[in-house]
């Protein structure tokens, strides 16, 4: 709890109204919330060292051969050549000769609860946090030590996040936005509105409220000042960052909020010390978000089914240092979509996105690897009418999509070290966490992945995971997920 609060307080370094009051309130609240009897118990420091590996730090000039990484009490304490680093006596050693060490991977945009079918919503009501935990364990198993959930049920995400932070369950470190501001919940016309006719109005209301928390479509009727009040309330709900819709979801050609309101949302997020990102699906919604001052454009490579992003706008992203989470897919997947699902809503969008991604690479945009992924229920996948394309280099399958996205960036010509940065240091910097995660330097949180093959030689080598270390402790990846609910076939699902 203390570590997460300190992270938020560091991010309140933004110069702006409310800083002294926020700090005074925050310190007082923390003092009242943690009595002396509740202080965390002292535990013996655990020291771990990885030796003999090629250490690939995304911020270093070159890989370090025969390197050593020393970790103590969850933090990196030393990184260097074997003959230059003293390993303390009694340290647990992982011999990584012939292997490669990289920072823990991340996904800038995923959904740990993405299961909007009525069967799952009904059957697991009150237990959504268990599915979030299952998802966070699938991501950790595949090297993602930190993930950023950009749309989901606030209460379930908060419960799972806090359980992982407290050591009550294994899983990737979670940061989340809760609702996409301006969107109604899953059983609405923004998502699966047609399903609402098959359940009670009470269930529809409960389900939608689990996502919305006062930030649904009603905001679009409000004045900027009224929206400001609503956003200020929402920043107190426990979310880690804000995401709003600059364009709509199902009807992707519509602009959601006016320029004035978008600026208000960004201002209030920054006032609370949070980064702010936006959902965009068109050239104009992208440009409006840039002008509003967002930190991250979510799937900003999606600009509609026809028009690519003008280079003028791409250059603006670089000039204003705005990061873009992208949804790259392999050429093989794009071919499968065009062959087996040519009438699919996203098929033409992904073709244009391919061109946008190439333009962003050329211009030097800070690109963040993302997948929009969630747990893919095996029964629903098997019954899919588009299974012929759904199963080719999947994008939205947790634990698989990020590997395919890396291969797609490689196909597009992104440099090998830049691919690594797109999953590590670029994401950390975009979320203003570069002092904690994303690189291998003393003082950083000790999140590492050990690979059996060199990722700089081929993107497929990211799959060759030998070990995952999170918070300075080796993860039992073979045991994950510990209690699968919907990711595997069982008699009751």
What are the roles of these predicted feature ranges?
Residues 99-166, 184-188, 281, 286-287, ...:
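Metal-associated gating/positioning segment near the N- to mid-region
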Residues 23-35:
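Bacterial N-terminal signal peptides
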Residues 271, 354-454:
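His/Asp/Glu-enriched, well-ordered alpha-helical/loop segment
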Residues 55-68, 81-84, 308, 416-420, ...:
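Acidic, glycine-enriched loop/beta-strand segments at the rims
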Residues 61-102:
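Histidine-rich, glycine-flanked metal-binding segment
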Residues 119-130, 207-226:
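Active-site mouth loops of central-metabolism enzymes
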Residues 132-156, 171-180, 238-250, 275, ...:
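Divalent metal-dependent hydrolysis catalytic cores, especially in the metallo-beta-lactamase
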Residues 124-125, 244-363, 368-370, 374-378, ...:
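Active-site core of metal-dependent hydrolases
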